[in-house]
């Protein structure tokens, strides 16, 4: 078994272009306003995978120059969704290489005829590398499968008599040592076992590498002079809230800005002018986490109004940004929100479900939030990549605290610490902070999960990466999640909070739950003695197949999962009185992985099944989390199940 040539990606299609053609500037969520419209392109798209030996046929035949159906047979593919589980084709489920999507959209006449209208194509997520054409013209490229990118297509749709546009995407899910997450292409050269050119995609993470258009695709408009970006940071001075804002405008240097902050009743509580300033909010309603306050998740609305006088006449633009006023701080032993100790009792998740894979789905999202609130969870980590923007918006609305993680999972190889990898990781953190900086629910950035941080190049890599993230956003702490030994971890000196994953009596000392308390307590003590920083138990858990029962408990039974959690909780209850500031179970729900003898149709460590039905551990954890909530905050009675009540979901 040998690895292919250094240019493994070349064998699968064009070289990795730089993402310089993606738009610079802001990445505000597309909201409708008096000056802005949007047209969703979700639904059925034409789809075709390039099964040619080199995966080059689509480029050689220029499939983007004509309707995709003219290139050969196509499939109907729902967007958003992963393409892997929708059909019955075994080859497509594990396909690696270029796939092609196409959709024709009819535009409102004003969009195509008004030169004062700017038309933007926005792709919420295309995993992993995407090239975009409109009417056969190349408009954008983007590397990375979890963050949005845009292209201004105004000139293309306003240059002819047509009121429609044909949008074509080529997407490649190949992972290399320099992608995030990393992977390798391994060519099988034994002719007695494998056909010529046979290769496999190796990954270093434990979830399925779903691919496709995972999040909404849409068109939206702005005026040609428009609000491009808004940055908000908040503070508190006694009972006065402080909202510092900075607004960026594109299209003209001559404009006026008015800024209004409205409370939940629509009353203006503060106002200002200009591109930057500070708003003071007397008798402020703070944004509090779920179960930490009787009135959690209070959101103000920041209304920004732009006016400009252009040669063609006056221009105006309006944008409304939800704002939660809160503070975050870290001490040697505490994580503070609004100056009060906050204890994370929550989950790790995945964007994963039957059939849709990682595709965004509103019913699934609402179900998950209902379960989180029922569970008494106040937090989750976006393991192991940024989640959809709509997820973050619901976290803002319902007070669910977020550790926002980059796709830096599986950084194992020395090559993945190269300057090429570091530069890409810096760019990804820039995109992540740009997208999520204004969410009050986001209280900490996580730059990676379980890297080989004991390798020598890890010290410079994480020192640089964390410093860069703090420079982008000085208002939040930064961490990465480790499973390295406390003495060997070269990245830990640079984090603000120690996040540790451990699986005592699961991945070692199989079945011996009696050693958990000693091993876990020793690990906590070693980490704290070395770094004097607060600690989060960022992962722990056990594989459990729903309906398997054994007493005395045996591995994979529901009883074993419960017993393991109980042993962890005994130590957590001791150490949370000292320096442990949180616990996040692995995992919220079962999820799909690559096939292997160690995985029975995916990872079964969920406290819920993949279909969101509870295992016995869910009830154990619910009892614990409501008990923790009773000790740490003001909330409704734990006897009452929590759900999303009377929510219009008008995000």
From Swiss-Prot:
The keyword Glycoprotein applies. Belongs to the glycosyl hydrolase 2 family. It is linked to Defects in GUSB are the cause of mucopolysaccharidosis type VII (MPS VII), an inherited disease reported in humans, mice, cats, and dogs. Keywords: Disease variant, Glycoprotein, Glycosidase, Hydrolase, Lysosome, Signal. Coiled coil: none annotated. The gene is GUSB. The keyword Hydrolase applies. It comes from Canis lupus familiaris. Inhibited by L-aspartic acid. NCBIfam families: PRK10150.1 (NF007538). It is found in: Lysosome. GO terms for molecular function: beta-glucuronidase activity; carbohydrate binding; signaling receptor binding. This is Beta-glucuronidase. Residues 1-22 form the signal peptide. Glycans are attached at residues 172, 419, 630. Homotetramer. One of its GO terms (biological process) is carbohydrate metabolic process. Plays an important role in the degradation of dermatan and keratan sulfates. Its EC number is 3.2.1.31. Disulfide bonds: none annotated. It catalyses: a beta-D-glucuronoside + H2O = D-glucuronate + an alcohol. Its main location: other. GO terms for cellular component: extracellular space; lysosome. The active site is at 450 (proton donor). It comes from the Eukaryota. It is an enzyme of class 3 (hydrolase).
């Amino acid at each position: 078994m040998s690895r292919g040539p250094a240019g493994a990606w070349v064998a699968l299609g064009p070289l990795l272009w730089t993402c310089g053609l993606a738009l610079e500037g802001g990445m505000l969520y597309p909201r409708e306003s008096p000056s802005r419209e949007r047209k969703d392109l979700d639904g059925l798209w034409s789809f075709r995978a390039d099964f040619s030996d080199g995966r080059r046929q689509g480029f050689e035949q220029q499939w983007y120059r004509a309707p995709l159906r003219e290139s050969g047979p196509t499939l109907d593919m729902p967007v958003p969704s992963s393409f892997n589980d929708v059909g019955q084709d075994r080859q497509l489920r594990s396909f690696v290489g270029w796939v092609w999507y196409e959709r024709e959209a009819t535009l409102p006449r004003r969009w195509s005829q008004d030169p004062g209208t700017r038309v933007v194509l926005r792709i919420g997520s295309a995993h992993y590398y995407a090239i975009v054409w409109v009417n056969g013209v190349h408009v954008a490229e983007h590397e990375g499968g979890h963050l949005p990118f845009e292209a201004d297509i105004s000139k293309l749709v306003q240059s002819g008599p047509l009121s429609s546009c044909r949008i074509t995407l080529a997407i490649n899910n190949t992972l290399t040592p320099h992608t995030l997450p990393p992977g390798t292409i391994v060519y099988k050269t034994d002719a007695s076992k494998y056909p010529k050119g046979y290769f496999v995609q190796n990954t270093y993470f434990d979830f399925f590498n779903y691919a496709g258009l995972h999040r909404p695709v849409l068109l939206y408009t702005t005026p040609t002079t428009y609000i491009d970006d808004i940055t908000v940071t908040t503070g508190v001075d006694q009972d006065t809230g402080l909202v510092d804002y900075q607004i960026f405008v594109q299209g003209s240097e001559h404009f006026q800005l008015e800024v209004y902050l409205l409370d939940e009743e629509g009353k203006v509580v503060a106002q200002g002018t200009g591109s930057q300033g500070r708003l003071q909010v007397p008798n402020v309603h703070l944004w509090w986490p779920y179960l930490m306050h009787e009135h959690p998740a209070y959101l103000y609305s920041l209304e920004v109004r732009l006016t400009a006088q252009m040669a063609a006449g006056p221009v105006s633009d309006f944008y409304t940004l939800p704002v939660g006023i809160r503070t975050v701080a870290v001490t040697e032993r505490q994580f503070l929100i609004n100056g009060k100790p906050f204890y994370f009792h929550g989950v790790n998740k995945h964007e994963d479900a039957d059939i849709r894979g990682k595709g965004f789905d509103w019913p699934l999202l609402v179900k998950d939030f209902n379960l989180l609130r029922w569970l008494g969870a106040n937090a989750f980590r976006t393991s192991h990549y940024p989640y959809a923007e709509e997820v973050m918006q619901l976290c803002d609305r319902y007070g669910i605290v977020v550790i926002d993680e980059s796709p830096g999972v599986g950084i194992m190889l020395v090559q993945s610490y190269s300057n090429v990898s570091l530069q890409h990781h810096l760019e990804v953190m820039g995109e992540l902070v740009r997208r999520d900086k204004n969410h009050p629910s986001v209280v900490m950035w996580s730059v990676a999960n379980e890297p080989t941080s004991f390798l020598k190049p890890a010290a410079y890599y994480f020192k640089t990466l964390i410093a860069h993230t703090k420079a982008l956003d000085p208002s939040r702490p930064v961490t990465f999640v480790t499973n390295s030994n406390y003495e060997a971890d070269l990245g830990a000196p640079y984090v603000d909070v120690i996040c540790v994953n451990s699986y005592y009596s699961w991945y070692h000392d199989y079945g011996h739950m009696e050693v958990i308390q000693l091993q876990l307590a020793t690990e906590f003590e070693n980490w704290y003695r070395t770094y004097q920083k607060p600690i989060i138990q960022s992962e722990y858990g056990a594989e459990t197949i729903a309906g398997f029962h054994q007493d005395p408990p045996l591995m994979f039974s529901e009883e074993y999962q419960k017993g393991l959690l109980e042993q962890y909780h005994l130590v957590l209850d001791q150490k949370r009185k000292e320096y442990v500031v949180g616990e996040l179970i692995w995992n919220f729900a079962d999820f799909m992985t690559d096939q292997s003898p160690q995985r029975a149709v995916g990872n079964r460590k969920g406290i819920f099944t993949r279909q969101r039905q509870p295992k016995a551990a869910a009830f154990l954890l619910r009892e614990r989390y409501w008990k923790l909530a009773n000790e740490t905050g003001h909330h409704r009675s734990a006897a009452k199940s929590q759900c999303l009540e009377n929510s219009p979901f008008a995000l």
